[in-house]
Curated annotation (Swiss-Prot):
SUPFAM superfamilies: Flavoproteins (SSF52218). The lineage of its organism: Archaea, Methanobacteriati, Methanobacteriota, Methanomada group, Methanococci. This is Iron-sulfur flavoprotein MJ0731. It comes from Methanocaldococcus jannaschii (strain ATCC 43067 / DSM 2661 / JAL-1 / JCM 10045 / NBRC 100440) (Methanococcus jannaschii). [4Fe-4S] cluster binds at C46, C49, C52, C59. Coiled coil: none annotated. Disulfide bonds: none annotated. InterPro entries: Flavoprotein-like_sf, FMN_Rdtase-like_dom, ISF_SsuE-like. Binds 1 FMN per subunit. Binds 1 [4Fe-4S] cluster. It comes from the Archaea. Its cofactor is FMN; [4Fe-4S] cluster. Belongs to the SsuE family. Isf subfamily. One of its GO terms (molecular function) is metal ion binding.
Amino acid sequence: MKVFGISGSPRLQGTHFAVNYALNYLKEKGAEVRYFSVSRKKINFCLHCDYCIKKKEGCIHKDDMEEVYENLIWADGVIIGTPVYQGNVTGQLKTLMDRCRAILAKNPKVLRGRVGMAIAVGGDRNGGQEIALRTIHDFFIINEMIPVGGGSFGANLGATFWSKDRGKKGVEEDEEGLRVLRKTLNRFYEVLKEKRGL
């Protein structure tokens, strides 16, 4: 079972902690994990130049997205985390998602059937976490992936944290957020196992 975790935060704080917590939790269950953070990475905007459509050989930009493409193809499951910026995902994460067009142009079914899970960290209790989760779920659905939440009563769409604008410390101290993350991870793990016939 191979899981790729992506942190869509330009900082190595709350979202970085939450995604790594998730990967370590799954690693203890026997998963092989890989991690990518947009922090300090060069990821150019999609120009809609259609190079990827015409050439079918990836993106015209040769930057840190190459690592993302490789790991998305490698993974059985994908966990994407984001802090909430202006009520939604970060610009860096949106750019990463937009740039996935390049591998889909080469093979439209390349991500089909992979299991996807979302994590959102907000400085406010109701800062847009669920909107950010839905944006990530839209990415999963558009690319024929299987989005999972943690189920009713607390983790409907995925894992959310209230950091109180205290970065990693705020996430570490959000006991309800950690409970919801584990609940969502357990469902993610179950679906991955079912998909792999384990």
